[in-house]
Amino acid sequence: MSRLLNDFNQSLHKGFIDKHISHKGNYTPKLLVNNKNEKVLSTIIDELQKCETFYFSVAFITESGLASLKAQLLDLSNKGVKGKILTSNYLGFNSPKMYGELLKLKNVEVRLTDIAGFHAKGYIFEHKDYSSMVIGSSNLTSNALKVNYEHNVLLSTMKNGDLVDSVKSEFDLLWQKSTPLTEQWINSYKESFEYRSLEKLAEVEQTQMLLADKVKKSVEIVPNLMQAEALRSLKAIRDKAKDKALIISATGTGKTILCALDVREVNPNKFLFIVHNEGILNRAKEEFKKVLPIKNDSDFGLLTGKHRDVDAKYLFATIQTLSRDDNFKQFDENEFDYIVFDEAHRSAASTYQRVFNYFKPKFMLGMTATPERSDELSIFELFDYNIAYEIRLQAALESDILCPFHYFGVTDYVHQGIKEDDVTKLRYLTSDERVNYIIQKTDYYGYSGEILQGLIFVSSKKEAYDLADKLSSKGIKSVALTGDDSVNYRQIVIEKLKEGKINYIITVDLFNEGIDIPEVNQVVMLRPTESSIIFIQQLGRGLRKSSNKEYVTVIDFIGNYKTNYLIPIALSGDQSQNKDNYKKFLTNNDSINGVSTINFEEVAKKQIYNSLDAVSLNQNKLILKAYEEVENRLGHMPLLMDFIQQHSIDPSVIFSKFSNYYEFLVRYKKIDTLLTENESKNLVFFSRQIAPGLKRIDSLVLEELLKNELTYDELKNKMLNEVKDITEDDIDTSLRILDFSFYNAGIEKIYGSPIIERNERMIRLSDAFTNALSNQTFNMFLEDLIELSKYNNEKYQKGKNGLILYNKYSREDFSKIFNWNKNGSSVIMGYMIKSQEMPIFITYDKHEDISDSTKYEDEFLSQDELKWFTKSNRTLESKEVQKILSHRAKGIKMYIFVQKKDDDGIYFYYLGTAGYIEGSEKQDK
């Protein structure tokens, strides 16, 4: 029996006969649903990545659903992989524009069936030796692939299987009777589609007119879930007699409405709203009018260069006008009960400070999307460190507050194979070849709606002007806007874009903030990412909801830039500086919730990986910057758990550069209290051995012994009764770690004196450690590290045998998890058989300078098959090799750990358990 057939037999046995068998198999049938941890879309993308051809049979397709597969389909096209899509015009659901998008797929043949009631949802993938299918309830729509509660089944079958033959035969039968999709067919369909759309529109308008007669002229606006939570937080702050608060809210998340709702709740006698831009000011006033009870229009006034409505109950002022002495001093300092500073990160500027320091309202609220932007005073300090609520991009998308987006990281134009790593050297930014390439990409990835209304961000003014001319000459109406243009001219151009009279506004950084163009349905980034904050600001220009679009397309041209690593940082919102997190984000198709998707073309993704590999994210200056940002937020020295709670740097990054956090604080003079040498070394121990949270039992045993000394039996019984899924061996290992007997001789030079002492009867804290506990500062750091250990341990709870697939582990970690008496780091040379475990640690790319005898040619033969070499000087008759060949009979489990190259340090990715393939052994030398 072939290995593939055997794998199928075991997979199907597990799927249809006995779920308890240990074989996990690559072909086990699987139910596909959409939930927080998995999406139907990710399976379809995964199958596409591996297939040699594909066939989709789906009744309903949306532009957004198709967009979520476009990057993958383009990569397949570049590899010569072709496919077929069979759909229909059933119920007139599919739009003419969507059919046009299907025609852009050069490697996909599309046909339409006129079979009555066509309602199929099937995806077939042909691989080299087998086929797989996703069949169930999901159409090719964003909601069906990512959000809706769906039931689909992933089935795999051998090429000669009856099921795949039946499904493929049915597909072929329909395909032969179907009509090829053409421009002519689309034009014909468009006429009937528009007629039906007009009929539906008339029905909707008639319904709206009937409803309008029954609805009051003024409808009370109620808060959404996130706004309601923020309002409760603001009230709680005021209830504590605090008079300032800060709202951090992603662009487009409705912070103005939130503010108006709070003002309605407070009902101040007089209210002041301050912002830097008159356009924002007018929009804010209109938003407030929708929320607040209006008695007279005169209740709302403006204080600008042209308006002086100083007696209005609700006054909206530009900072440029208000900050003049003769303007703000005409008011009494207590005149306003409630003052709002919009774009509050500007509040540290001198113009704002004059106003900020003059007025004494009962309550002052700051609102910003980017509190980190200030280069002067701390915004957090200005608002007394009272963060009422924080709405970041991911959370806003999950709550459906923002317009969904499809992000495409695409490969930038390469001139004659030359890769430039400095945009200022690239002479071809606006060459005809690159402009044609840009048009090709932006057309392929498209936009939602009938008219293209986009923003393009470039690197220089000259590039903006030249690109606008080139695009316009090719029929794509474009206008460049820069800081040299007047405010009035900018507004005229913006209105043209809103009305669809032009297709693109091209700028450098003019629209990073303070601009509101909800109609934008495509954002194009033609410059390297230099700042994750600016990246999100520019992406955010398209995230306001608008009736002209269902989603916004974001196209990011990724060149050979050193700063590409900032892209996953920006998109994920993850400020941990942890490279592993960013690499997982790049490979995880479920990395963002809601119908939004993040997609990378294969070459572009490789360029980001290269940038991540090259950059050092644990530089002292980056750690110090993260520290100062959190310190600014809190107003005091942060502890390690503060970094976690403030979504800042991962403490493990600090430990990769400093032996412990105390050492970092001393280096940068952030702490006055000094510890003894032994106390500092003990903190090194806790930072390296306890804080990672590898085993929950370690921190629990420590906490028990911190309370009082115990006999071994007392400790054992307490742990076994109170903690699930632990053994006596786990407790013994924890004790060996705490008394340092787990480690090799001389470890005290690094970790100081042991933490505990024990004899045949009692276990207690060592004298040196007891003395350290009398130091309040040492205690503070210790408690923080224990809390960090508990937090980190949560990610290990779901692991079988303490190991989680694709997590990173060291040889020492393995020794702890499997309760070896001693740290095996120095004795596991590639692999080791001990008890019933055999960990295998493989470095895939060896250094060129290692000896030929150890330059093993380990190699992945397939996704689940590895060619592996034993140590040198072994034969098939060697006792060790015989153990490996008979490992199943002897009950020995193999665990595979892999790192890419020696430079990756002591950590290896865990790929799972393995088994020897009978008959595959060979003595090479």
Residue ranges, per PLM feature:
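Long, largely alpha-helical accessory region at the distal end of helicase-like NTP-driven motors
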Residues: 194-223, 443-444, 448-449, 453, ...
